[in-house]
Amino acid sequence: MKDHEIIALFFERSERAITELMGKYGAAIKNVASNILKDAQDAEEAVSDTYLTVWNRIPPEEPKYLGAYSCRIARNLSLKRFHANTAQKRNSYYDVALDELEETIPALSTVLA
């Protein structure tokens, strides 16, 4: 099915539009998400979010190249998830180090004054 036919299905709000999009560009969308997000579950969620975003944006938008449009959405959503994941872990090294340090420092009651 050609891009303009799939876009017409989106304008009709036919659920078949998602099926056709998955059939034609699903592998490319999944590759984009998987290359950015190494975790398979995160990549799968990004792919699902991509389909939902495309569904919500068409209409009113009418992309000329549906594959590039969908992959760009997948890329942006994947990068957003990647940055959120890495931001959460940014100081986790210090948390672990402080926990280990806490175990090695003697309690105040055992220190001689």
Which residues are covered by each model-predicted region?
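Short alpha-helix-to-loop micro-motif enriched in aromatics/charged/Gly
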Residues: 58-64, 85, 89
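Solvent-exposed, non-membrane alpha-helical residues enriched in polar/charged side chains
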Residues: 7-8, 19, 30, 34, ...
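Amphipathic, Lys/Arg- and hydrophobic-enriched alpha-helical face
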Residues: 22-40
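Acidic, proline/glycine-rich intrinsically disordered inter-domain spacer in sigma factors
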Residues: 99-113
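Acidic, Ser/Thr- and Pro/Gly-rich low-complexity regulatory segments
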Residues: 1-3
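Structural recognition of an alpha-helix C-terminal capping motif at a helix-to-coil junction
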Residues: 31, 45-52, 56, 64-76
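Arg/Lys-rich amphipathic alpha helix in sigma70-family domain 2
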Residues: 75-93
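Short loop-to-helix capping motifs
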Residues: 13-14, 39
